[in-house]
Amino acid sequence: MKTINNPKRKISVTNQRSYCDWTDGIQVVRKGNGEIAMTESELTRVFGVTWRKLNHRLQTLMKSLNLHPDERSAGEEDIYANEQLKGYAPLYSLTTIIALSFQLDSTEAHLFREYICERLLKPASVITPIFLLGNTNN
């Protein structure tokens, strides 16, 4: 899993989002603040597949009626080169990313599915409220 940071690409400041990436210990980490949404290039890096394979699976998902229209797209990201706007890259929501992971057969996709299942099975923290009755001044 080779990660390449392209300094020519900038993320729009108005579009605050998170994305998934890998640590050196082959663990999924969430980076950024906001809802998870990823571009095709980020998805190819995370799932360790070629763009062609990823694009084919994405097109299949988008054409199927299994996803609600709101789950299919998470907006667009501005693409800049030499400080000039060159175009837009579609962003895919977490729902689409999870569905896509079940259509890919890479080791990274398998580990991502395990991570998602682990997070779902992990019990949520329970906060016990404490109510103070009567005079609370000491």
Predicted ranges, named:
Residues R52, H56:
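Key DNA-contact positions within bacterial/archaeal DNA-binding proteins
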Residues N66-N82:
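Short Lys/Arg-enriched helix C-cap and helix-to-coil transition segments
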Residues R57, L61:
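Residues in the recognition helix of alpha-helical DNA-binding motifs
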Residues M1-E42, V46-F47, W51, I79-N138:
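Positively charged, aromatic-accented nucleic-acid-binding surfaces
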